Amino acid sequence: MHFLDQAKIFIRSGAGGPGAVSFRREKFIEYGGPDGGHGGKGGDIIFEAVPGLNTLIDFRYTQHFKAQRGHGGAGSNRTGAGGEDLLIKVPVGTQILSEDREQVLADFTVPGQRQVFLRGGDGGRGNASYKTSTNRAPRQHGTGWPAEEMWVWLRLKLLADCGLVGLPNAGKSTFINAVSNAKAKVGAYPFTTIRPQLGVATHKGREFVVADIPGLIEGAAEGAGIGDRFLGHIERCRVLLHLVDASGDDPVGAYEIVRGELDAYGAGLADKPQVLALNKIDAVDAKTLDKLAKKLAKLGGGEVMRLSGASGEGLPAVLDKIIEILGPAPETTAANENDEPWSPI
């Protein structure tokens, strides 16, 4: 499935239906008086967070969403039928932003969360409601309240337990492939990963979701390489695994760049629990590893773990550490086997 983490859509609620202009007509009653009913209410635009989806790709092809207009009123004081609400389903973790992206209008963090986003217009008054002692046969009626409409941005922030960070070619994709069934693309060149990947890791009977974001570069927090978008995906991760390529030209400098970008981005990223690990240790001698570990420990103020995503060396210890930070697994409810396939509407 292709990953898309933002989409712009147009939404419009239903306008209210017009009130009716009608007069009572019965045998032997010459002047029956007005009996036009009110128009029906327009449909609402409702968003709902649904589980089981991690992309906004469907909104690339369906961009306009319009709820049904309310039906017109009728004689005999009959109110028109209300317009049908339009339910738009989004992945859990979706935010709705204003067109200028300056304001978060809604944030869907829980499966099943619903919000009436645009309210349908009220129906117009029928002519019966305009009758007065001086105007017994009114012909005016309400046309119904107009619909609400706007362009909004949908932005998806992945909900994962552990987020992988590091410079390009730090071995993040190899790691997520080694601990899960993510099947992320791996290559011996930077920027092999060009979109976020999710994988479910299982270790000692404990499952947790791992998010692999594309490698960061200097200036990512300000948008370089659209790194600000990628950093947004790890805002909700409970722990970060910072991988440093031990075989790189300057592992210490690589650590400092990523750490600086986390600090610059804000949103509490730099304060999240973090596991720091030297990767690709099978390509470096033990003496060099010891020196690097000491330097990084002094900078990071904590334990520096060692692993090789390619050979699997050190992976169990790193997974143990992640599980220790995550704590006990939350209780989950079994999915309903009769659930319908996902659709944006």
From Swiss-Prot:
Mg(2+) binds at S173, T193. It is found in: Cytoplasm. GTP binds at residues 166-173, 191-195, 212-215, 279-282, 308-310. Keywords: Cytoplasm, GTP-binding, Hydrolase, Magnesium, Metal-binding, Nucleotide-binding. The keyword Lipid metabolism does not apply. InterPro entries: G_OBG, GTP-bd, GTP-bd_Obg/CgtA, GTP1-OBG_CS, GTP1_OBG_dom, GTP1_OBG_dom_sf, OBG_GTPase, P-loop_NTPase. One of its GO terms (molecular function) is GTPase activity. It comes from the Bacteria. Belongs to the TRAFAC class OBG-HflX-like GTPase superfamily. OBG GTPase family. Monomer. This is GTPase Obg.
